[in-house]
Amino acid sequence: MASAAEAALASPTSGRESGLPDSIEEEKRMSAIATIGFGEAAQAFVSGWRTENGASPGKISTFDIKVEDPSQRGDLLQACSDLGVDCAETPAQALTGAGTVFSLVTADRALEAATRVAEFLGRDALYLDCNSCSPATKAAAARLVEAAGAVYVDVAVMSPVHPARHRSPLLVSGSSAERAQDVLLGLGMQARTVGDEIGQASSIKMLRSVMIKGFEALTAECLLAARRAGVEKAVLASLQASDPGIDWTMRAAYNLERMMVHGKRRAAEMQEVAATLRELGLPDRMASATADWQLRIGELDILMPENSLEARADAILERDLT
């Protein structure tokens, strides 16, 4: 019997060629994988699948709006070619025959992506919304997807996608979460069901980000100021004495790197976190301030300095942060 991974990655074949009954053939026809978006997360997942399942596990296609931008199209086509992915010109082309669809765009484009692709989803296809969005945003996307006859699943990616790639921990929720978990496990992914309601997985992700991304923003505000004041060594020594379980210098350098490389994407996520807090009837002051810091540093587009806190802080402080 074929593994779930093989089933999810099988190439479509016409019933006339295979001689299989129509119902079985339809299942085979809808067994390809598609991604909406082909950035860091999608490429990490696909490279992991390719490594685990062999050089040619089957058909994977993608639609990414960068294909419509002449300045970004070439890099997208090269990335797809490197990983054996069909780069579609339209959502309809990407989703033809796709029984499993991963939405992997930025948080601020997730609802737009669902709106654009919903009509092209196959009936009963799994739409795995892996974007870092508020429960309300995911619920709105779910209505669009399910109105088109597909199956919406809330997926939260709970760690950076590197180095784990497709083995990054995932939380899933929704009425078809168990079905989605089986598909994900079959692809060698680390998925766990956390509930049968849309929004449960994303709530965990969103509220965790208050702490994780907020800590990054606090790091920037504290240590950039300390570096400019010339007292960063004393501040770090005090932090180390207060909480020796953290290597504060190393963690601060890492936190700045995360913001420098991913700040724009993290800012979009933190706007969704702020929306989540408001939906819960709570103030969003910390989340909104975190979004501001993430965006300020991410928009600097600094070439990553050496792996040292001082070099990274200096590279940021050379720019205008006001």
Predicted regions and their residues:
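N-terminal polybasic/positive-inside topogenic patches
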Residues: A7-S18, D22
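NAD(P)+-binding Rossmann beta1-loop-alpha1 motif at the extreme N-terminus of oxidoreductases
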Residues: S23-T96
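Rossmann-fold NAD(P) dinucleotide-binding segment
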Residues: P91-V151
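Rossmann-fold dinucleotide-binding core
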Residues: A110, C133-K213
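Helical "substrate-binding/catalytic lid" subdomain
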Residues: I204-L309
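Short, basic/aromatic-enriched C-terminal tail that caps enzymatic domains
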Residues: E306-T322
